[in-house]
Amino acid sequence: KYGIINVHSSLLPKYRGASPIHSAILNGDTETGVSIMYIEEGLDSGDVILREYCEITEDDTLGTLHDKLKELGANGLTKALKLIENGEVQAEKQDDSKATLVKPITKEQAKIDWNNTKEVIYNQIRGLNPFPSAHTSNEKGENIKIYKSEKIEKKYEDEIENGTIVEIINKKGPVVKVANGGLLILEAKFEGKKLQKGVDIINGRKMVIGEKLLYSDSSLK
């Protein structure tokens, strides 16, 4: 009689599919939300009962945004059920021409390519935190998961390869050279070790100037 409804963590028809929260951060979006929709045969293509909107801040991670949307989804679902109960639903057909489809996150997407810009890598790190987490490796072959970073607006010498530790910021952490500046590592986890702050990484000399971080081929662990 009433149909089956669902909560989807994006502003449909954008980001239909398996990884809408990751994708919003990876793409540097500043707004997302939830859609309360009717389920039909197509993937996330049913009529939308209502949308609830949410800002994505520069500091949001997959984890924090997931929690915001969970709350928003619960509120939206309550409103939608009330509309259905009162016979006040004015569902909106989705514009399929504006639909984007997102697949599950792959292991490949979690590897950091230091030839990318600081913005791309910064979004990759927060968009995959806490899981599967963006990762790199060092010249010793250790896999390193990076959980938090900060963009550094600075020009480093062209001769220095991207992925090289170019600077140590006192009481903060190591800076890695990328395509258009640097990225300060604030939280990372070495294979088999616990999560460390950037300051502890430099104090323990786990990363030193001149060391190279690589596009990791090791499997996620």
What are these model-derived regions, one by one?
Residues 115-221:
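An anion-binding loop in the catalytic cleft
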Residues 14-18, 114, 194:
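Alpha-helix N-cap/helix-start motif
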